[in-house]
Regions:
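Bacterial N-terminal signal peptides that target proteins for export
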Residues: 1-8
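Bacterial N-terminal signal peptides
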Residues: 9-16
Length: 154
């Protein structure tokens, strides 16, 4: 009996670790009562210059905003509840601009409700969620520049 309990305990621990390992590259940026902001550290790439060079002032990143239940119900999309807004953006660290390359709206089950490409370039507004993400990505890119450079060259 004790052997079965130990096997069950070990199985549960392995399951718990394997389910969190996939999310390990999503770094928390900030949260308020309505939205949590995260970015994918593994997705960071610097912009390319020619074939061999990179521009460390241009950073590509996947990030998302997870919406609270009450907040998401106030802002439906085509009658559906949006739980997550996932974005792929190009950040210009010199000009403090963000270029939306892809925006994906997901429901509570993770299904895509809507998708839009090339949403344009805009300046990052102070005190916005994009500004929080921008600052976190900029700092992460500064600290991990060598790792991101290697990933960007591949």
């Amino acid at each position: 009996m004790l052997k079965k309990q130990m096997v069950l305990l070990i199985s549960l621990l392995l399951l718990a670790f394997s389910s969190t390992a996939a999310a390990a590259n999503w770094q928390w940026v900030a949260s308020d009562e309505n939205v949590g902001v995260f970015f994918d550290t593994e997705s960071l790439r610097f912009g390319k210059i020619d074939k061999l060079g990179i521009d460390k002032n241009i950073v590509y990143v996947w990030w998302y905003m997870a919406l609270d239940d009450a907040f998401s119900q106030k802002q439906p999309y085509n009658g559906e509840i949006v739980k997550k807004i996932v974005r792929y953006d190009k950040l210009n660290l010199n000009e403090q601009t963000i270029t939306g390359l892809e925006v994906i709206l997901r429901d509570t089950d993770g299904f895509i409700l809507g998708q839009k490409n090339n949403t344009g370039t805009e300046h990052i507004a102070p005190d916005s969620r994009a500004a929080l993400m921008y600052s976190a990505v900029k700092e992460y890119a500064r600290i991990h520049a060598e790792e991101i450079t290697e990933r960007s060259i591949k």
